[in-house]
Amino acid sequence: QKQTNYALGNLTKEEFVKELTTGILPAPQYFAKAAAQNKKGYKSIDDVFESSMNAMSIEQMLEAQNKGVMVLDTRKEGEFSDGHIPNAWYIGLHGQFAPWAGALIVDMHQPIVIVAEEGKEQEAIMRLARVGYDNVIGYLEGGYAAYAASGKAVSVVPSITPEEFKANAPEGQVLDVRKPSEYDNCHIENAQLLTLDYLNEHLDEVNKDKPYV
């Protein structure tokens, strides 16, 4: 190992630490908040379910959204892209749900309404509560299908092929939201790096008057 393992080579303490920590992102913003909350104590999971498992009508959900409540869509990525409630956030239950919630939802006391696949509402509430987000006020009754059937406005996230991207992407208006190590390994020329985990902290670097890919 001393002959082949770089970590056991002739490194100073400073060189060793630098070698092991290069490229490592800071801890997600919710870590410190969750640690502080751990000292105070959380609501029991039974209390969380009692306050969160409230079926809400479309009108109740939209009224809450207008008052600053986050509508969180937890369906599959493709389903969200094909159609979702305007201004809804997306974090899919089928991926790393809890870590992404912790990285992207800055306020741990943010009131939330869940839009989930039928039968997945309680799972979403439980997984949010596990990382400290226990202020879910309800879920949309009937899910997105009920909303779509109501005829109300929907939003979509269009996707394009690499060929379409190459032909039409405006120079300097490409956002790369991967991790710095992935960006450094290979990226689209002139793409702007804004790692998704910390996008909230750098929104002032995005020109809101321009379209981005």
For the regions a language model picked out, list residue spans one by one.
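Short loop/helix-cap segments at secondary-structure boundaries that form the rim of catalytic
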Residues: F80-P86, Y183-E189, V206
